[in-house]
Curated annotation (Swiss-Prot):
<comment type="subunit">
    <text>Monomer. Interacts with DivIB and DivIC. Interaction with DivIC stabilizes FtsL against RasP cleavage.</text>
</comment>
<feature type="topological domain" description="Extracellular">
    <location>
        <begin position="57"/>
        <end position="117"/>
    </location>
</feature>
<protein>
    <recommendedName>
        <fullName>Cell division protein FtsL</fullName>
    </recommendedName>
</protein>
<comment type="function">
    <text>Essential cell division protein that may play a structural role. Probably involved in the regulation of the timing of cell division. Also required for sporulation.</text>
</comment>
<dbReference type="GO" id="GO:0032153">
    <property type="term" value="C:cell division site"/>
</dbReference>
<keyword id="KW-1133">Transmembrane helix</keyword>
<keyword id="KW-0472">Membrane</keyword>
<keyword id="KW-1003">Cell membrane</keyword>
<dbReference type="GO" id="GO:0005886">
    <property type="term" value="C:plasma membrane"/>
</dbReference>
<feature type="transmembrane region" description="Helical">
    <location>
        <begin position="36"/>
        <end position="56"/>
    </location>
</feature>
<keyword id="KW-0131">Cell cycle</keyword>
<comment type="similarity">
    <text>Belongs to the FtsL family.</text>
</comment>
<dbReference type="GO" id="GO:0043093">
    <property type="term" value="P:FtsZ-dependent cytokinesis"/>
</dbReference>
<feature type="topological domain" description="Cytoplasmic">
    <location>
        <begin position="1"/>
        <end position="35"/>
    </location>
</feature>
<keyword id="KW-0812">Transmembrane</keyword>
<keyword id="KW-0132">Cell division</keyword>
<dbReference type="InterPro" id="IPR011922">
    <property type="entry name" value="Cell_div_FtsL"/>
</dbReference>
Length: 117
């Protein structure tokens, strides 16, 4: 006996679709080319820094040498001044006359000519 009016309920099947897994590729935050450029830039900055420091040190050493030479020049100038003063003291006419009289020389006023420099 078949009942044509009878239709069995069909079970609703929920089709479980397989979830698509999205694979997210993690990119490096910095690419290899950027890393190379960064390293080259850091090396350039380091090189320039070392160059600047070395030039500053050379200038410092030169300044020290200049100061030493200036001190030496000033001491030489002082010594020259002292020697000029002693030359002036030793060449005074009165001193020369005293030494001449001490050694037995006589001054004859008629034969003496006074020469001024």
């Amino acid at each position: 006996m078949s009942n044509l009016a009878y239709q069995p309920e069909k079970q609703q099947r929920h089709a479980i679709s397989p979830e698509k897994k999205v694979i997210v590729k993690k990119r490096a935050s910095i690419t290899l080319g950027e890393k190379v450029l960064l390293v080259l830039f850091a090396a350039a900055v380091l090189s320039v820094s070392l160059l600047i420091v070395s030039k500053a040190y050379a200038a410092y050493q030169t300044n020290i040498e200049v100061q030493k030479l200036e001190e030496q020049i000033s001491s030489e100038n002082k010594q020259i001044g002292d020697l000029e003063k002693s030359v002036a003291d030793l060449s005074k006419p009165q001193r020369i006359m005293d030494i001449a009289k001490k050694n037995g020389l006589n001054l004859k006023d008629k034969k003496v000519k006074n020469i001024q420099e």
